[in-house]
């Protein structure tokens, strides 16, 4: 078994539930409204449109969140941590590698204006999903690629899009997709400081970058 001390050194190793930090019962304090969508409650309620939710992990959540809030049809975005063990972790705890969480963006979208399939196309094309426990220069389990699905339909579409994107990646000489695709776990929202970070700090770090490979047009629409 890998020891806790080894995980602190090698952050590519997932901790077990027993090794994970205990966390806390109290969630992080969040702003009431979205910083970019002025007047829009960060977590709802959302009264207009056919609202649905998507959860994506594609590396550092600062840059990922910005790309999704820029998409027409997206009505809110929140960054957080998911897929691990520690309840309500701090950013520092996630960075330690001892929570098991990856950084994610919760995307709230109007299905009448943008489809889940279109968001999946964005997800695949915005990052390199073949890198395992890293994304570019960002290394560790918190940067692993993930799609967490809120319905059986989302799970089916996510797996189909993965298979189609793998075919395109293979043609371009890339390796196997390592993206974790699963039913949605609990998303623990990140500290207020991280919410819409690049809107507050336009010159801030953004490590997001794709492979240049695209999904076939037939899989990018409704």
Curated annotation (Swiss-Prot):
Keywords from the UniProt entry: Oxidoreductase
GO cellular component: cytoplasm
Keyword DNA damage: no
Enzyme Commission numbers on file: 1.8.4.11
Gene Ontology terms describing biological process: cellular response to oxidative stress; protein modification process
Annotated signal sequence range: none
Catalytic residues (UniProt): 60
Catalytic activity: L-methionyl-[protein] + [thioredoxin]-disulfide + H2O = L-methionyl-(S)-S-oxide-[protein] + [thioredoxin]-dithiol; [thioredoxin]-disulfide + L-methionine + H2O = L-methionine (S)-S-oxide + [thioredoxin]-dithiol
A GO molecular-function annotation: L-methionine-(S)-S-oxide reductase activity
InterPro entries listed in its UniProt record: Met_Sox_Rdtase_MsrA_dom, Met_Sox_Rdtase_MsrA_sf, MsrA_MetSO_reductase
Family note: Belongs to the MsrA Met sulfoxide reductase family.
NCBIfam families, alphabetized: msrA
Role played: Has an important function as a repair enzyme for proteins that have been inactivated by oxidation. Catalyzes the reversible oxidation-reduction of methionine sulfoxide in proteins to methionine.
Protein name, per record: Peptide methionine sulfoxide reductase MsrA
Lineage of origin: Bacteria, Pseudomonadati, Pseudomonadota, Gammaproteobacteria, Pseudomonadales
């Amino acid at each position: 078994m890998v020891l806790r001390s080894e995980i602190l050194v090698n952050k590519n190793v997932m901790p077990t539930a027993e090794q994970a930090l205990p966390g806390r019962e109290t969630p992080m304090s969040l702003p009431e409204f979205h910083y970019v969508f002025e007047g829009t409650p960060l977590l709802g309620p959302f009264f207009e449109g056919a609202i649905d939710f998507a959860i994506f992990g594609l590396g550092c959540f600062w840059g990922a969140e910005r790309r999704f809030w820029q998409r027409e049809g997206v009505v809110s975005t929140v960054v957080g941590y998911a897929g691990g063990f520690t309840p309500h972790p701090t950013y520092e705890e996630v960075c330690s590698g001892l929570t098991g969480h990856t950084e994610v963006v919760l995307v709230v979208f109007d299905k009448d204006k943008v489809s889940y399939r279109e968001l999946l196309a964005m997800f695949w094309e915005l990052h390199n999903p073949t890198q395992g426990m890293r994304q570019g220069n960002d290394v560790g389990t918190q940067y692993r690629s993930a799609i967490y699905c809120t319905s059986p339909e989302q799970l089916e579409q996510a797996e189909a899009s993965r298979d189609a994107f793998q075919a395109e990646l293979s043609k371009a000489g890339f390796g196997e997709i390592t993206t974790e695709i699963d039913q949605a776990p609990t998303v623990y929202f990140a500290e207020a400081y991280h919410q819409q970070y690049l809107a507050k700090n336009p010159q801030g770090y953004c490590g997001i970058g794709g492979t240049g490979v695209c999904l076939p047009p037939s899989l990018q629409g409704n």
